[in-house]
Swiss-Prot record:
The lineage of its organism: Bacteria, Pseudomonadati, Pseudomonadota, Betaproteobacteria, Burkholderiales. HAMAP family: Undec_diphosphatase. One of its GO terms (molecular function) is undecaprenyl-diphosphatase activity. It is a multi-pass membrane protein. This is Undecaprenyl-diphosphatase. It holds the Pfam family BacA. The keyword Cell inner membrane applies. It comes from Acidovorax ebreus (strain TPSY). Coiled coil: none annotated. It is found in: Cell inner membrane. It catalyses: di-trans,octa-cis-undecaprenyl diphosphate + H2O = di-trans,octa-cis-undecaprenyl phosphate + phosphate + H(+). The gene is uppP. Its EC number is 3.6.1.27. PANTHER family: UNDECAPRENYL-DIPHOSPHATASE (PTHR30622:SF3). One of its GO terms (cellular component) is plasma membrane. InterPro entries: UppP.
């Protein structure tokens, strides 16, 4: 396989890993990177879905102690069952809405104006959430969440179906607006990512299975490995970062990136559509 193509796969894997769990929309960055690299044909979109697997494995590894302890304790401990139930409740709204409206949303909302608007609006929402965070925290740990809290965050996660929103951005910032601390919202967002990304990935790959080929295994493997490594580093860094910093820098980054979307769309440099 072409070495240059493998290098592009590695770069795309790094982009996926670094942006999947930050509140800045991995999809927007993958579209931009793919366009600049000339890695944006139909098979590239399947590749983008597949390399999410690496990012998912990274989160599982970071939280493995908690995940393992929960699985072991499920038959005997009420707290473990409540935690698992909260993740399930948060996961279900996106499943239902995705099956009902996923195709329509992609067909009608994937435009430069929508993508740019959601990037910019999301930035201002982060600024607002951070201002409220100082006085509105009522939940300091994931274990303190109720099923109703989980449902509310799950409903907010549905907003991530609008292109440019960011799944992690919707769940983290939505959680903060609903009263979760910055750490609790981030932890729950990561736990919620595991079933959400696995479910979306399996469903999307099944739909696009005709584009899959054994000859592409090296390409996908390179992207997955680099996605895993960069996501693992990014998640660990973010968990340390939020202990003493806010999400305000990400807000300004989103606003700037939204302007980049508009400029690249109007200039014809990038096709912001799927």
């Amino acid at each position: 396989m072409d070495t240059l193509l493998l290098l592009k796969a590695a770069i795309m894997g790094v982009v996926e890993g670094l942006t999947e769990f930050l509140p800045i929309s991995s999809t927007g960055h993958l579209i931009l990177a793919g366009s600049l690299l000339g890695f944006d044909d139909a098979k590239a979109k399947v590749f983008d879905i597949a390399i999410q697997t690496g990012a998912i494995f990274a989160v599982i590894l970071v939280y493995w102690q908690r995940i393992r302890a929960t699985l072991v304790a499920l038959p005997t401990e009420r707290q473990a069952r409540r935690f698992a139930l909260n993740v399930l409740i948060g996961f279900l709204p996106a499943v239902l809405l995705g099956l009902l409206l996923g195709k329509a949303i992609k067909a009608h909302l994937f435009t430069p104006v929508v993508v740019a608007s959601t990037f910019i609006l999301g930035g201002f929402v982060i600024l607002w959430a951070e201002r409220r965070q100082q006085a509105a925290v009522r939940i300091h740990a994931v274990d303190d969440m109720t099923p109703l809290d989980a449902l509310k965050v799950g409903l907010v996660q549905c907003l991530a179906m609008v292109p440019g929103t960011s799944r992690s951005g919707a769940t983290i910032i939505g959680g903060m607006l609903l009263g979760l601390s910055r750490k609790a919202a981030t932890d729950y967002s990561f736990f919620l990512a595991i079933p959400t990304l696995i479910g979306a990935g399996v469903y999307s790959l099944y739909k696009e299975r005709a584009l899959l080929s054994a000859a592409d295994i090296p390409l996908f493997a390179v992207g997955l490995v680099f996605s895993f490594i960069s996501a693992w580093l990014c998640v660990r860094w973010l968990l340390r970062y939020i202990s003493s910093h806010s999400f305000v820098p990400f807000a300004w980054y989103r606003i700037a990136f939204g302007l980049v979307v508009l400029v690249t769309a109007w200039s014809g440099l990038v096709t912001w559509a799927e």
